[in-house]
Amino acid sequence: MKYDLIIIGSGSVGAAAGYYATRAGLNVLMTDAHMPPHQHGSHHGDTRLIRHAYGEGEKYVPLVLRAQTLWDELSRHNEDDPIFVRSGVINLGPADSAFLANVAHSAEQWQLNVEKLDAQGIMARWPEIRVPDNYIGLFETDSGFLRSELAIKTWIQLAKEAGCAQLFNCPVTAIRHDDDGVTIETVDGEYQAKKAIVCAGTWVKDLLPELPVQPVRKVFAWYQADGRYSVKNKFPAFTGELPNGDQYYGFPAENDALKIGKHNGGQVIHSADERVPFAEVASDGSEAFPFLRNVLPGIGCCLYGAACTYDNSPDEDFIIDTLPGHDNTLLITGLSGHGFKFASVLGEIAADFAQDQKSDFDLTPFRLSRFQ
């Protein structure tokens, strides 16, 4: 059988692409080296932030606003356990932070609902938070967090129900191109399609070694917290920048555990076995201490943690482009640790590509040619 579309990597973007392409009436094969959702990529750990006033650059705002619409739509499939939780996101940092300046600029340009607070205003609204006098907070009331593993599970189930073929626990070992389209090689045999989407995450270079993507081992952990830090108590998700520039992110507490991670740093790795489990690197358990000690002093000890991987591009902006020389193969990679919130819209973009439809978005900033 020749498919309309083969998806290589069915984690966040791949799961969304499989659903949207199948829903559009295409004959789709989703593949993954493991059984998604799984612990081998970048999507595990239950939750991911979604921010609209984007500190990484205004070019992302149209994408994330469309992503939010799609997340809201997907959440209606799980109303008892919503995929999106509108907790709000407070962005904390020094008043001269470049990241916060970008957040404010994005909010102004796109007329987003963002409230600016000074240090006293932050601590008055959330007494659990402590910040220096020179700090400000930009509170995104319409943002929040996503249930990452639940989202992937939902997409995969919906795609399957719509007739999508799924080949999991089956690594793709090679991609070939010819006049008939794309052929993938797997341990289960060869499969052909008119087009392919490569969204294989951290280990995309195993298939396409020429891509400028660097895997980085990252960790996040859960710390002892009480009901003051919960959504029920209106405690928000957050990003925070320390005076030395280190950047952290976190979520309201659930079941007396608050999840936090450090966005920058990590360990450069070159193979999957180098991503050792949480606590096997000496700094894992204490990585969040500078933020917790200074900003959330009421949080207790580290309960447990996990390791994941970022697929970093050289400039930490996404790569969304066709494979050079092969216009029938779309690459979505280099998401650099801030991609999950965009998974829905990136999946839709992939489905549009498979249908020969022009994207509604300006994807020029994400082309591979910027690295030449």
Swiss-Prot record:
Binds 1 FAD per subunit. FAD binds at residues 4-34. Its EC number is 1.5.3.-. It catalyses: N(alpha)-methyl-L-tryptophan + O2 + H2O = L-tryptophan + formaldehyde + H2O2. The modification S-8alpha-FAD cysteine is found at residue 308. It comes from the Bacteria. Its cofactor is FAD. Gene3D superfamilies: D-Amino Acid Oxidase, subunit A, domain 2, FAD/NAD(P)-binding domain. GO terms for cellular component: cytosol. GO terms for molecular function: flavin adenine dinucleotide binding; N-methyl-L-amino-acid oxidase activity; sarcosine oxidase activity. The keyword Oxidoreductase applies. Keywords: FAD, Flavoprotein, Oxidoreductase. Belongs to the MSOX/MTOX family. MTOX subfamily. Monomer. Catalyzes the oxidative demethylation of N-methyl-L-tryptophan. This is N-methyl-L-tryptophan oxidase. It comes from Shigella flexneri.
